[in-house]
């Protein structure tokens, strides 16, 4: 599994959804953390298929983390990738960091020019809010909301605030 194989999986989901006779022509794609990066990359590859994009604490740090040799709880030599990387209870294959090692994620996401909502917590200890700010600057049409005190994976109070932003964005 890698971010790029997850993009392929999401592309298959989009194709399937588009094939259903009862689905709308408009698609709102949403992802959180790594799923946010996957959704952003997928929207960039298929800008005509995605009407709106919602990213909650998107993990645009993944390529930088791979280059630095630390991802989640794992540490490794980025110049000599091991076959397996142990991230706590979740082992990752070499392909996980390898797929993003040379990626400029902010360049990769810019082909998507549709509307984007980014919601990120100011107290996120996993993905610094600066990544969300940089993404908002990279997109042509982005709305960024920073949730004061929000961590990576919002708590109940922060969920409520994030859902308010999502509901307003989806209603437009």
Protein language model features and the residues they cover:
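Short beta-strand/loop motif that positions the catalytic acidic residue
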Residues: 112, 118-120, 124
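Alpha/beta-hydrolase fold nucleophile elbow
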Residues: 21-32
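Hydrolase active-site cap/lid region
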Residues: 45-92
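Active-site nucleophile elbow and catalytic-triad environment of alpha/beta-hydrolase enzymes
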Residues: 90-108
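Catalytic histidine-centered segment of alpha/beta-hydrolase-like enzymes
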Residues: 150-161
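Conserved alpha/beta-hydrolase "acid-adjacent" motif
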Residues: 125-131
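Gly/Ala-rich beta-loop-alpha elbow adjacent to hydrolase catalytic centers
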Residues: 31-35, 39
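Alpha/beta-hydrolase active-site loop
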Residues: 1-20
């Amino acid at each position: 599994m890698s971010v790029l194989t997850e993009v392929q999986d999401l592309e298959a989901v989009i194709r399937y959804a588009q094939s259903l006779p009862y689905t709308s022509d408009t698609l709102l794609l949403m992802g959180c953390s790594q799923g946010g990066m996957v959704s952003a990359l997928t929207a960039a590859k298929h800008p005509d298929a995605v009407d709106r994009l919602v990213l909650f604490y998107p993990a645009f740090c993944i390529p930088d983390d791979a280059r630095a040799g630390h991802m989640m709880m794992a540490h490794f030599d980025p110049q000599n990738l091991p076959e397996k990387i142990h991230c706590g209870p979740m082992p990752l294959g070499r392909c996980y960091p390898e797929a993003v090692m040379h990626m400029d994620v902010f360049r990769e996401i810019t082909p998507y020019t549709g509307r984007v909502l980014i919601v990120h917590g100011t107290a996120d200890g996993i993905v610094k809010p600066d990544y969300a700010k940089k993404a908002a600057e990279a997109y042509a049409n982005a709305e960024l909301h920073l949730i004061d005190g929000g961590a990576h994976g919002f708590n109940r109070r922060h969920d409520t605030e994030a859902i308010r932003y999502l509901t307003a964005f989806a209603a437009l």
